[in-house]
């Protein structure tokens, strides 16, 4: 299953083996940099501090609110720090609801923010759901904030959608999948071979730079993103920093819907939205609402 995803695999022990997009690849091979390798999300404080300076995603909130009702039980797959489920718990009187994410740091933050006994944060793999989740059925299953983008191929996404369908309570239950809007991947082709740098200030007051290098595969609609942030210098004068290489499939409704149908699902509606921050700010996103066929 790891072959079909673009993140969260095992980290290489030898940082020189990580392949970054040009020109950041020169940092790895320079011989003057001592680097750490990160999964990027939640497991590296420097990247984490940068993320705190970006706009917190809310573009999928209204779509989720449109299908959630008082008394519902919700399963949020790839919940991160619980931003979506915590929001819904404030807006609705939910029954037993669960969020699951592979990051222990994200789940720790989720647990720290929970103020409801019926909201549960679980550290685990969304491809191997634990018994406390599989023994239940849910009114709404969510993949918020483009969670499915780390899935690179059709077969892997079908496995995940079939698993989500198996957790639905009845014919009135729904699955919510947040993706890019049709046409957005083509608009992102300008990012191919582009390098950007973003200044930000860390919580300790230090200024820092984060560098991004991109390679876009327009045939497979996969965006390769390499990232480097410098954290200082060591006693030998070498650069210290952290690197990560991410791959994201730019899923859209047109690409998702045939796979959903193969998974025994049908489309109820598609809700338009847009990217709130970053290089793709203002570009179209979409929330696809699915139900059992």
Per-range role (PLM):
Residues 3-70, 83:
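Conserved class I S-adenosyl-L-methionine
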Residues 78-80:
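Class I SAM-dependent methyltransferase "Motif I" SAM/SAH-binding loop
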Residues 83, 88-128:
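Class I SAM-dependent methyltransferase SAM/SAH-binding core
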Residues 131-140:
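A short acidic, Gly/Pro-enriched loop at the edge of an enzyme's catalytic core
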Residues 139-155:
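A short SAM/SAH-binding and catalytic strip from SAM-dependent methyltransferases
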Residues 158-170:
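A short glycine-rich, Lys/Arg-flanked "PGG" loop and its adjoining helix->strand segment in the class I
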Residues 177-254:
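SAM-dependent methyltransferase
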Residues 249-293:
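C-terminal lobe and adjacent flexible extensions of AdoMet/dcAdoMet transferase-like proteins
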């Amino acid at each position: 299953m790891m072959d079909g995803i673009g993140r969260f695999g095992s980290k290489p022990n030898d940082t020189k083996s990580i392949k970054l997009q040009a020109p950041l690849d020169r940092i790895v091979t320079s011989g003057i940099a001592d680097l750490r390798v990160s999964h990027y999300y939640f497991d590296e404080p420097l990247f984490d501090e940068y993320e705190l300076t970006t706009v917190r995603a809310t573009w999928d909130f209204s779509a989720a609110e449109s299908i959630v009702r008082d008394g519902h039980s919700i399963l949020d797959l790839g919940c991160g720090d619980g931003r979506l489920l915590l929001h819904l718990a404030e807006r609705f009187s939910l029954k037993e609801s669960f969020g699951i994410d592979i990051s222990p740091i994200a789940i720790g933050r989720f647990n720290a923010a929970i103020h409801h006994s019926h909201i549960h944060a679980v550290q685990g793999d969304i491809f191997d759901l634990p018994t406390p989740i599989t023994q239940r059925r849910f009114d709404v299953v969510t993949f918020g904030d483009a969670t499915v983008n780390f899935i690179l191929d059709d077969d892997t996404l079908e496995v995940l959608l079939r698993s989500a369908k198996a957790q639905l309570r009845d014919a009135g239950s729904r699955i919510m999948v947040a993706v890019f809007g049709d046409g957005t991947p083509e608009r992102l082709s300008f990012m191919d071979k582009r390098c950007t740098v973003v200044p930000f200030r860390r919580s300790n007051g230090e200024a820092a730079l984060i560098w991004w290098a991109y390679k876009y595969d327009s045939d497979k609609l996969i965006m390769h993103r390499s990232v480097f942030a410098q954290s200082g210098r060591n006693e030998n004068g070498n650069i210290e920093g952290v690197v990560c290489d991410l791959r994201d499939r730019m899923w859209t409704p047109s690409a998702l819907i045939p796979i959903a149908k193969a998974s025994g699902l049908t489309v109820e509606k598609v809700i338009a939205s847009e990217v709130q921050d970053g290089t793709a700010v203002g570009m179209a996103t979409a929330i696809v609402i699915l139900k059992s066929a």
